[in-house]
Curated annotation (Swiss-Prot):
Organism placement in taxonomy: Bacteria, Pseudomonadati, Pseudomonadota, Alphaproteobacteria, Rhodobacterales
UniProt xrefs under Pfam families: Aconitase
GO molecular-function term, one example from the UniProt record: 4 iron, 4 sulfur cluster binding
Source organism: Dinoroseobacter shibae (strain DSM 16493 / NCIMB 14021 / DFL 12)
GO BP of this protein: L-leucine biosynthetic process
Protein name, entry field: 3-isopropylmalate dehydratase large subunit
Amino acid sequence: MTARTLYDKIWDAHLAHEAEDGTCLLYIDRHLVHEVTSPQAFEGLRMAGRTVRAPDKTIAVPDHNVPTTLGRENPDQMTEDSRIQVEALDKNAKDFGIHYYPVSDIRQGIVHIVGPEQGWTLPGMTVVCGDSHTATHGAFGALAHGIGTSEVEHVLATQTLIQKKSKNMKVEITGKLRPGVTAKDITLSVIGATGTAGGTGYVIEYCGEAIRDLSMEGRMTVCNMAIEGGARAGLIAPDEKTYEYVQGRPHAPKGAQWEAALAWWKTLYSDDDAHWDKVVTIKGEDIAPVVTWGTSPEDVLPISAMVPAPEDFTGGKVDAARRSLDYMGLTPGTPLSEIEIDTVFIGSCTNGRIEDLRAAAEILKGKKIAVKRAMVVPGSGLVRAQAEEEGLADIFKQAGFEWRMAGCSMCLAMNPDQLSEGERCASTSNRNFEGRQGYKGRTHLVSPAMAAAAAVTGKLTDVRDLM
């Protein structure tokens, strides 16, 4: 048999039909749903008199619009648009009989944290959601990517998706990471090296010693931002860490089913002589703690660097850099470590897990914030409960952080947690576009530890100076 990549193997296992022009019909194992991209899809089912084809494989949770303050069940805390969307999801979940974690459920949280946490995400699966950061689930060796609302309706109705196959791209991170360097630094560094279009047309498989050394939560951070690198999806082959994470979770296989699943999962790796259409190799020891300076995730530099000048770029990037610097209010030649910060946000589907909170709390222990406001938003109610049990919440609160309820929060300006005009934020989220966190808000993407360092110094700071 021809040597295949991990992507090839998962694709082949789910291929229901292939047309002469390469258009394929794929079977979908898990469909994750949230309140923003699903209302029109469910309404389309109603109008056509259709049911959800596989309600047992469809999981819904409100996350984008929900407030993160106490008493958030009160509809007055939401804008009318947000309230309508959350109430629509409540009704649609009930009417169509799908799995649902409402705001009142401790298991509620960001859909890409809830899925793995509850054992819905398993190796070798196809996973889709009407959300671009669905690639997160690729950390389990699952083929996971975002879809549009019309596709959400198609999957709800048929449990299949029409697709054309992407090309194979390998991103290898060799060697060991240095102290203070994290999964977030890996994924930002890859995007900085390849650009936001570097993965366009590809599915990325991340591999190498530095990737293998990561925990499952670190791997989720890496895969989460595959989309910012332009890729359709990001994958990491499953291994013992994967199996250990999955085993015993509420919806993971058990008994004989576990053994059968495990046998298949152990075949999910890229063959040694598989063909790659593109290969990128980065030495792990060359990666430093990084920060974004502009308005694209590819605007990445080590914290030790200086704000670049437009003249440092070529072609169309000269004008783009000039616009970014103007929007961000930065002067070329300024050391990144001298940029003052107003706000710190720790959370999101990129960095809202328990290990992220532990890393931030380790830096904050015994210190006070030097910024105007700082908030920690756990990725799920269960993460929040665990952080409280471990004493992390007390560390955050004593440092001066707001300790919030679970949700997407300040990652995107679709709920009450937003930046004001000109407000500068060190954020553990995934996008630094103009207006992403609020009208004319300024975003610097960093790891949780780097965000904590900025909180206590009041400026972008090399976390290694505080370790």
